[in-house]
């Protein structure tokens, strides 16, 4: 009886076993969204890893993010800086990718004059990182509120299983900026109090 060569035998086994080509992964934006949604309900402590002078006051504060609630199309993440609970990140699905907005509130829950700014992803990005260039609505808001330095903002978020990062950059020039805070996903912390104005959002 003629014996099959090892390589031929392996090929035959795979063929007879109905081996199929793996399905292609989802869009990077969808993968990224799913990574964040998997953290829903949990809170994590972070640290400032950049050294811009504008962020000096934040350097000594306790930084906590809380993936507070998630739907199929939106994730809400309050970001607490010490006792200041005014900041919330909103990640929303769009037809082309993802949108990041910043919801800023006063302690009584009223919207700050500088709120609902951000931008949409301009490309596919990666499952681990998405970037959000400033949108036209936010540029108009920044100019109206005397924050013209912010009209070139690009925000980014990263999630790689070990850490979550939030980042702000501006290109080189008189308004150059780099802010980045990283959160350790390996150690959850107790849930902080709700963000200001969280009720009804």
Residue locations for each model-derived region?
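Tryptophan-anchored aromatic micro-motifs
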Residues: 25-54, 102
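An exposed acidic His-Trp-rich patch
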Residues: 89-141
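Short beta-strand segments that buttress and anchor functional surface loops
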Residues: 48, 75-82, 102-103, 166-170
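Helix-rich interaction surfaces within compact, conserved domain-sized segments
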Residues: 130-171
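Short, solvent-exposed loop/hinge segments that bridge or flank secondary-structure elements
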Residues: 45-72
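Edge beta-strand at a domain terminus
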Residues: 115-120, 161-201
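Bacterial Sec-dependent signal peptides at the C-terminal "C-region" and cleavage site
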Residues: 15-26
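Short, surface-exposed coil-to-beta transition loops
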Residues: 60-62, 84-88, 150-152, 176-178
């Amino acid at each position: 009886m003629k014996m099959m060569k090892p390589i031929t035998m392996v090929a035959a086994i795979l063929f007879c076993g109905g081996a199929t080509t793996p399905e292609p992964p989802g869009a990077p934006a969808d993968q990224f969204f799913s990574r964040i949604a998997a953290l829903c309900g949990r809170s994590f402590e972070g640290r400032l890893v950049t050294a811009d002078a504008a962020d000096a006051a934040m350097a000594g504060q306790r930084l906590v993010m809380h993936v507070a609630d998630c739907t199929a199309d939106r994730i809400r993440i309050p970001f607490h800086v010490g006792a200041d609970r005014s900041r919330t990140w909103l990640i929303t699905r769009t037809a082309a990718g993802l949108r990041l907005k910043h919801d800023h509130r006063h302690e009584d829950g009223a919207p700050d004059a500088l709120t609902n700014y951000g931008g949409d992803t301009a490309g596919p990005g990666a499952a681990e990182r998405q970037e959000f260039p400033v949108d036209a609505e936010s540029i108009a808001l920044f100019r109206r509120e005397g924050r013209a330095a912010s009209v070139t903002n690009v925000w980014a978020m990263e999630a790689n299983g070990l850490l979550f990062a939030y980042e702000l950059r501006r290109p080189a020039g008189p308004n150059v900026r780099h802010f980045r805070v990283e959160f350790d996903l390996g150690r959850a912390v107790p849930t902080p109090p709700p963000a200001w104005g969280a009720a009804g959002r």
